[in-house]
């Protein structure tokens, strides 16, 4: 039971950190890149392929963010089950 709790806590911590990294760094960067590329496309400095690539990159990161949030919640459920109680605190 202790090993399950340790494993679940480690998964919870990793998933929560990944979510924070996506929220604080990767998604804002991808949004900024898309806006810059969109502006460049509007004035003819970027081609349609570049705009499409920026949009796809943002969508992939948004999908990764959703999956990371799911992974965080599932790991927390596993931790609660291993401990037989509510996990301490709201975040790892």
Report the location of each language-model feature.
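Amphipathic alpha-helical coiled-coil segments
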Residues: 1-64, 71-82
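Terminal intrinsically disordered/low-complexity segments used for targeting and assembly
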Residues: 80-92
């Amino acid at each position: 039971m202790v090993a399950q709790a340790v494993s679940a806590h480690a998964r919870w911590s990793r998933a929560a950190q990944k979510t924070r990294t996506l929220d604080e760094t990767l998604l804002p960067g991808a949004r900024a890149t898309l806006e810059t590329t969109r502006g460049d496309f509007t004035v003819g400095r970027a081609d349609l392929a570049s705009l499409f690539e920026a949009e796809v990159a943002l969508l992939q990161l948004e999908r990764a963010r959703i999956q990371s949030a799911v992974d965080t919640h599932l790991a927390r459920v596993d931790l609660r089950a291993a401990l037989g109680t509510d996990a301490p605190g709201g975040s790892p």
